[in-house]
Regions:
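Short hydrophobic beta-strand element within catalytic cores of glycosyltransferases
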Residues: 72-75
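Aromatic "clamp/platform" in nucleotide-sugar-dependent glycosyltransferases that forms part
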Residues: 55
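A charged, aromatic-enriched C-terminal amphipathic alpha-helix characteristic of glycosyltransferases
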Residues: 114-149
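Conserved catalytic-core segment of nucleotide-activated headgroup transferases in glycan assembly
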Residues: 1-34
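Short alpha-helical segment that forms part of, or immediately flanks, the ligand-binding pocket
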Residues: 41, 64-68, 79-83
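Conserved acidic donor-binding segment of nucleotide-sugar-dependent glycosyltransferases
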Residues: 89-97, 104-114
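Short alpha-helical donor nucleotide-sugar binding micro-motif in glycosyltransferases
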Residues: 42-47
Length: 150
């Protein structure tokens, strides 16, 4: 599906240094690969990163799920994404080399850590919860209504 921008991911992967590209094993979870909740968490905890280059859809749950599982997220810097995804995880949507550089950095950190499963990152869970909890959504709606009535 074009809005997922898998062609962009292919451009990033084919632009990686060979020694990094040889270590990369892509898993496209979604329409073709269905996982239970437990399998999804395990896959994310064993993944080097979640790449989320989409530029034409609203907020996506995969980054929130990945962050909750402790998986690093690399996402396109767009308004729908930057409401929840921390700035350090956002890259220019069309800059292949910025994505290549970030994948190389994440891969190096993964290798230094011995490729062990990741643990949930409490700071990212708190970040997502603060953005997506019913209380946070209620405050955002109240603010939007207040602004609309001014």
């Amino acid at each position: 599906e074009p809005r997922k921008r898998l062609d962009f991911v292919r451009d990033v992967i084919t632009s990686l240094p060979e020694e990094v590209a040889q270590d990369i094993h892509m898993l496209h979870i979604g329409s073709e690969v269905k996982l239970s909740d437990e399998q999804l968490v395990a896959a994310l905890q064993h993944a080097e990163a979640l790449l989320f280059p989409s530029i034409s859809e609203g907020f996506g749950y995969p980054p929130a799920e990945a962050m909750a599982a402790g998986c690093p997220v690399i996402a396109a810097n767009l308004p729908a994404h930057n409401e929840v995804i921390p700035e350090r995880c956002l890259l220019p949507a069309t800059d292949v080399m910025a994505w290549v550089d970030e994948v190389v950095k994440v891969h190096a950190a993964w290798k230094r850590a011995g490729g062990v499963p990741r643990n949930p990152d409490d700071s990212l869970i708190e970040h997502v919860t603060a953005s997506l909890s019913p209380e946070a959504q209620g405050k955002a709606m109240a603010k939007a209504f207040d602004n609309a009535c001014e």
